[in-house]
Amino acid sequence: MGFDINWGSALYQLLAFSVLLFFLSKFALKPLLGIMEKREQMINEQISSAEKNRKDSEAFIAEQRQALEQARMEANEIIQNAKKLSEQQGQDIVKAARNDAERIKESAVAEIQREKEQAVSALREQVAGLSVLIATKVIEKELNEAEQEKLVQEYLKEVGEEL
């Protein structure tokens, strides 16, 4: 059984394979490699874009957290200012109420004092009138001391009943 190689056929197959390889590399392999390079470049760009988007997202999240913290601080400050303002207003209201009460008290005391002075003045006028009346009657009657004392006591008793 011999294993004979047909050298003409082998050479022909080698030549055909070389020509096929040449044409494949010239017309099929270069465009295929170009497509693969473009695909690799596109994938690299997408990876870069995704990485950039991730970094931008992290920066945005950090900014949002900072803005949220700032908003919380401002809200707390507003609440504290509102508390202080309400306390101040409460104190102002109490102070105004005390001032009004003091003013009303002083007005009432002044009114009482005026009425007291009017009562004393009226009493003086009555006493003066009674004194004149007593003096007139004393002169008219020309009483002795005991009768005069009795008459004064009667008039004082009358004055006490009128008051």
UniProtKB/Swiss-Prot annotation:
It is found in: Cell membrane. GO terms for cellular component: plasma membrane; proton-transporting ATP synthase complex. It is a single-pass membrane protein. Keywords: ATP synthesis, Cell membrane, CF(0), Hydrogen ion transport, Ion transport, Membrane, Transmembrane, Transmembrane helix, Transport. Its main location: membrane. The keyword Chaperone does not apply. Pfam families: ATP-synt_B (PF00430). It comes from the Bacteria. The keyword Transport applies. GO terms for molecular function: proton-transporting ATP synthase activity, rotational mechanism; proton-transporting ATPase activity, rotational mechanism. F(1)F(0) ATP synthase produces ATP from ADP in the presence of a proton or sodium gradient. F-type ATPases consist of two structural domains, F(1) containing the extramembraneous catalytic core and F(0) containing the membrane proton channel, linked together by a central stalk and a peripheral stalk. During catalysis, ATP synthesis in the catalytic domain of F(1) is coupled via a rotary mechanism of the central stalk subunits to proton translocation. Component of the F(0) channel, it forms part of the peripheral stalk, linking F(1) to F(0). Belongs to the ATPase B chain family. F-type ATPases have 2 components, F(1) - the catalytic core - and F(0) - the membrane proton channel. F(1) has five subunits: alpha(3), beta(3), gamma(1), delta(1), epsilon(1). F(0) has three main subunits: a(1), b(2) and c(10-14). The alpha and beta chains form an alternating ring which encloses part of the gamma chain. F(1) is attached to F(0) by a central stalk formed by the gamma and epsilon chains, while a peripheral stalk is formed by the delta and b chains. This is ATP synthase subunit b.
